[in-house]
């Protein structure tokens, strides 16, 4: 198994229970956040049959869930009409020289104030996912993960969270205030985390959308793509082709 997959699974087990559902499907369930797609996905080990997908759909309907998500490490030959998104796992090799990463000396890194963190995330995620979900999600994550905040002039201008296991450190949820873009906020956060990881002999990694620009920036910083997750989501069951 690719080592980061083991760390990712341990991450999900912080929030979700896992149970075998069918020959090719394992179900994740987070009863604290029933409406969070990633925490309640079906993980496939091979191509699900139409009968398996029908059973998965019936299960979701019985739970009152209005979505169906499948994810796995190989593309599906039959996606049943669902759109696919690809997420890269990018690892920073431990020998990477990070001294050239540009940072902002006026930025301080510390644990963010809980209220400031909620307001910071509401500003961006509220319009996308709704205020109620954004607050519930942040509080759920904050209970079990380590958040880091970037402060400039006493203001929280960036944040992310980290999860460490088995010699690997995953950095995710990076969010920078758009009013402070191009001031090396993200780079300062990332360098802080990378330095700590290297000091402890741990390997830093992150996830990046295969279609978005940040993956190219990460590559220039020295991150290398080592894995790819295929994610299939349906929020309108009438569009499923089964």
Map each language-model feature to its residues.
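Conserved active-site alpha-helix within GNAT-family acetyltransferase domains
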Residues: 73-84, 187, 210-228
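Short amphipathic alpha-helix that is part of the acyltransferase structural core
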Residues: 1-12, 38-44, 88, 96-137, ...
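N-terminal charged segments
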Residues: 1-63, 67, 130-131, 135
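Acyl-donor-binding surface of acyltransferase catalytic domains
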Residues: 45-107, 232-234
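Conserved GNAT acetyl-CoA-binding A-motif
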Residues: 62-71, 197-209
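Conserved acetyl-CoA-binding loop-helix of GNAT-fold acetyltransferases
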Residues: 50-57, 176, 182-195, 220
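A conserved beta-strand-loop-helix scaffold within acyl/acetyltransferase catalytic domains
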Residues: 129-177
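Conserved acetyl-CoA binding element of GNAT-fold acetyltransferases
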Residues: 36-46, 167-178
């Amino acid at each position: 198994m690719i080592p980061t997959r083991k760390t990712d699974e341990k991450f999900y087990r912080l929030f979700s229970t896992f149970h075998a559902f069918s020959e090719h499907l394992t179900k994740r369930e987070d009863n604290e956040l029933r409406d969070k797609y990633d925490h309640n996905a079906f993980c496939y080990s091979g191509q699900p049959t139409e009968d398996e997908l029908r059973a998965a759909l019936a299960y979701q309907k019985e739970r009152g869930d209005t979505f169906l998500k499948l994810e796995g490490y190989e593309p599906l030959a039959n996606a049943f009409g669902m759109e696919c998104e690809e997420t890269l796992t990018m690892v920073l090799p431990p020998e990477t020289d990070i001294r050239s990463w540009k940072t902002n000396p006026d930025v301080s890194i510390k644990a963010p104030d809980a209220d400031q963190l909620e307001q910071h995330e509401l500003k961006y995620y509220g319009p996308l996912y709704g205020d109620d979900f954004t607050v519930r999600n942040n509080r759920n994550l904050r209970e079990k993960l380590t958040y880091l905040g970037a402060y400039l002039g006493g203001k929280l201008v960036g944040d992310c969270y980290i999860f460490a296991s088995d010699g690997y450190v995953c950095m995710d949820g990076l969010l920078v205030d758009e009013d402070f873009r191009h001031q090396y906020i993200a780079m300062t956060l990332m360098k802080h985390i990378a330095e700590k990881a290297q000091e402890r002999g741990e390997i830093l990694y992150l996830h990046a959308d295969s279609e978005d620009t940040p993956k190219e920036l990460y590559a220039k910083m020295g991150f290398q793509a080592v894995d790819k997750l295929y994610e299939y989501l349906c929020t309108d069951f009438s569009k499923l082709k089964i």
